[in-house]
């Protein structure tokens, strides 16, 4: 987890150069989670999507801060000890209808769109045999969130 958080911190630093320090990254995760094992680049595509889809030029012109949060926690889910990583933002969000369409797209064949999200979903499904390893939600015009759930495993040294 620690390595993945470093990747997204660096990515957000780059985006701050691009947008002039108008983005904020918040991370909330217990230090005990830092040694948890996660697939490589499981979070960065979600943060990239937040910038690409959630950040409206209008917000930048109105001098609003674009905020992205990553929250990690260990939680039991269906009798499994799991790691939940949630990436959410205060961007423009999507409608309930479009959110449902996006959920349906996860299981469809590649059409060249939603590559990052579909890739994360399929990797979790293949690696952990979890059909519900990715959950998508939106508060219409007040942001978007993606929850990634995988079995909790400590890094072995």
Protein language model regions, located:
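Two-component histidine kinase transmitter core
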Residues: 151-155
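Two-component histidine phosphotransfer core
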Residues: 1-137, 144-149
């Amino acid at each position: 987890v620690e390595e993945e958080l470093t990747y997204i911190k660096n990515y957000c630093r780059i985006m701050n150069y691009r947008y002039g320090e108008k983005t904020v990254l918040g991370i909330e995760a217990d230090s005990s989670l830092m040694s948890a094992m996660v697939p490589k680049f499981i979070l960065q595509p979600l943060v990239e999507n937040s910038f690409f889809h959630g950040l409206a030029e209008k917000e930048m012109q109105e001098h609003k801060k674009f905020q992205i949060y990553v929250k990690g926690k260990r939680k039991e889910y269906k009798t499994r000890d799991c790691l939940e990583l949630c990436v959410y933002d205060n961007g423009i969000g999507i409608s309930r209808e479009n959110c449902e369409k996006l959920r349906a797209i996860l299981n469809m064949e590649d059409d060249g769109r939603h590559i990052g999200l579909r890739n994360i979903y399929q990797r979790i499904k293949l690696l952990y045999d979890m059909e519900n390893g990715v959950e998508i939600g939106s508060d219409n015009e007040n942001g978007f969130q993606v929850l990634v759930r995988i079995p909790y495993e400590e890094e072995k040294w």
